[in-house]
Each structure stands twice: as C-alpha cells, then as structure tokens.
Amino acid sequence: IGLPVKGGEPVEAAAERVCRGGSCFPKDTKALARIGQEHASPISIVETVIKVNEDVKRRMIDKLVDLCGGSFNGKTVAVLGVTFKPNTDDMRDAPSLTIVPALVGGGAKVRAVDPQGKREGEHLLPGVHWEDDPYTAAKDADLLVILTEWNEFRALDLSKLASSMATARM
C-alpha cells in the first residue's frame, strides 16, 4: 500500500496475515497430529500446518525488525489489536503473545489498543502502555502493526494515522 502523506512520502506497508490463533485451532491440529503419530500414520499436512502457523509469527517479527532498520531498540511501536480475533477478549494463542514480547524484549516502547483485550492484555503483555484510541497510539510511532482485524480499525483514516507517526511504516 502506498498512501500519500505530508511531504509526499508513501506509507511503507507490509500486508500479511499473521497466523491463526485462538485455543481451538492449535489444540485441534496438535491432537490430529498426535493421533496420527500414535497410530504410526503421521499426518504430514497437519504437522506442516502447525509448523507454518508458528513460522509465520517468526517471519512477522523478522519483517518488523527489518522495517525498524534492524533493531527494535529505541523504537516506538503502535500495536492495534491483541486478541486472537475481533469481537472477543480472548487472547489464548493470539499472535500478540509472541510478537509483542519480541518487540518489548528488543527494546521497543509498545503502545497497544484493543477494543476488548486491554484487561487480559495488561496481565499477559507486561511492559506495554495501553492507549484508548489508535490515533493516540500512533502519534510519533516509528511503526504501526495491526494484529487483529477489528472493524474499528478498518474504518481508520490511514493518511491521518501516517501523518501523525514519526515514520509512516505500517
């Protein structure tokens, strides 16, 4: 996506679905894989799905590091959405539980917004500063990451978000 922002610079964006989270998908795929192994009949496609779902989170972290110039240290990152899917406060196996600690552990200042995930997120994601709205989270941020597809985020004015950021990277 290349959006015009003040100064004519485009917004740098990477579009990739993070992975499938929640408690059911990982539990069910692991159970299927275990059943196959117990019966000496591995289900390689299911085992591959499990591996890919985990690898996608790692690749996302690598892409975010690249967008930050090789390090999260000293960067401010706005994270929109921490629940595993919209319209819930459920964070079981959410991508944010892998990605946000990598940001914080790498020295980033993380500002997060989630319409329903703040209460759980405060316990599960230490070191995160919680904001009430995406525009406040994005102000002077070096990077903005959307981890959950809340309808509230679909309606955001991306040009307004980008123009408030230190560097327009989404």
Task: Tell me the role of every PLM-derived stretch.
Residues 1-170:
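Structural/interface elements that position substrates and couple domains in central-metabolism enzymes
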